Amino acid sequence: MTTPASEATPVRRSHPTRWAALVVGVVAIFLLVLLFTARTGERRTGTTLVGKAAPGVEGKVLRGDAFDLGNADRWVVVNFFATWCTPCIAEHPELRAFAEEHAKTGDARVISVVYDDQATAVQRFFDQRGGDWTVFDSDEGRTALDWGVAKIPESYLVSPNGTVVAKFISGVTQAQLDAVIASYDDEAGS
């Protein structure tokens, strides 16, 4: 016995609009998750170095005086950058303001490590944008590897006792650096 065609269960066909809506929904959820988990430039991030002794900084000095991080006895911002990096260019005035302010008291300084860039481009960058601090050549990336640099700009704040206390990704501001220093100074004063 067969069922008449009018009583047969209709075959469901997928509609392209349903698939498109599903794909758009999945992509929207993915982008929202990405947005909320990758807030760059506005926060400190964890790293395996935070709480540990800072690695050395080596390489040819391109600008400024030779500097030994192990004998700093003050706060040091170690900044990894390149002249072709847009966020690096954007953060440079903040680093310059921090360096100038703390040069007055001598309690902190900035050093930069070039990441995949040319010495002539770095010289031109500092000549045009200012900044009077020590700049190390990249030493073929060994220093960046020692510090665990994944992308630039990355900055590390090292305490006067040589411990890495914070890591900043995708740019840092003078206010962020000063806030971390103040929080440690407050703890020391308590």
Question: What is the meaning of each model-derived region?
Answer:
Residues 89-129, 139-145:
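Structural microenvironment flanking redox-active thiols in thiol-disulfide oxidoreductases
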Residues 124-131, 138-190:
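Thiol/disulfide oxidoreductase modules built on the thioredoxin-like
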